[in-house]
């Protein structure tokens, strides 16, 4: 229902307009206060890069964060990552992730990023505290990438990158809750790069698509072509589950059942195992896998995806960030 409201297919969005005007008024006032320096943002001693979005829901932001961190690491840059840790609840903040940190403590995206990149990752509702925690334990870090947080103006930033779903884009264009917008589309004029996940990019936007890898068994780590798996049940607890189901079909998989779950939904063995019957194979997203690995069955697999950015702009962006991190 929410997708139909935000896309404009359902007329119910009109009933929510008063709340949207209130949301827009408050969010605009907050940004204006920081812009006029009525409120002070904390500036880190190293450059900060924000990877965020203008809309609620999945846009492919986390794969972009992983891509950015890995690309900078390949250039010899020491990167730290901070996040709010949405969906997790730590005993205290900031929380610096370790190999023992669970998604229940830190949230699923931070754990995924930590496992994929081996970069220092810290979470806190106050992102400046997370930055301080990383720099205290890893003083060699040269640049901070913040996963989401475009609207978290308490943390000053050097570079802003926005990720857009190229198919859904901005829906009906209204602020939450009548539409998907956290900020209006005009905000794009002030950011440094716009990355478009799928669809047809517009002038000045960087095209991106998600490239699926081999399926990975949660229990054994065995890899295989996902099309070799039989009697597949697909599960996705991400911001936009249909994207994952479409990716499977693109890989030649015709799931016997597709199970969309809420983003950041808590998972347990009983609920997940009930999704598959004898002889079926469960295939999930990598984001779900970080929550299920501790209690996985032998027939549970996940499909990792990597962000692939096209054109000349990604190289220019990476050069800019490398120089920034190097102090040039």
Curated annotation (Swiss-Prot):
Enzyme Commission identifier(s): 2.7.1.130
Pathway(s) the chain acts in: Glycolipid biosynthesis; lipid IV(A) biosynthesis; lipid IV(A) from (3R)-3-hydroxytetradecanoyl-[acyl-carrier-protein] and UDP-N-acetyl-alpha-D-glucosamine: step 6/6
One Gene Ontology molecular-function label: ATP binding
Catalytic reactions on record: a lipid A disaccharide + ATP = a lipid IVA + ADP + H(+)
Keyword terms: ATP-binding, Kinase, Lipid A biosynthesis, Lipid biosynthesis, Lipid metabolism, Nucleotide-binding, Transferase
Coiled-coil ranges (or none): none
InterPro entries the record matches: LpxK, P-loop_NTPase
Top EC group: transferase
Transmembrane region(s): none
A single cellular component GO annotation: plasma membrane
GO biological process, any: lipid A biosynthetic process
Binding-site positions, ATP: 55-62
SUPFAM superfamilies for the chain: P-loop containing nucleoside triphosphate hydrolases
Keyword Ribosomal protein: no
Function (record text): Transfers the gamma-phosphate of ATP to the 4'-position of a tetraacyldisaccharide 1-phosphate intermediate (termed DS-1-P) to form tetraacyldisaccharide 1,4'-bis-phosphate (lipid IVA).
Cross-referenced HAMAP family: LpxK (MF_00409)
Membership in a protein family: Belongs to the LpxK family.
Alphabetical list of NCBIfam families matching this protein: lpxK
Protein name: Tetraacyldisaccharide 4'-kinase
Species classification: Bacteria, Pseudomonadati, Pseudomonadota, Gammaproteobacteria, Enterobacterales
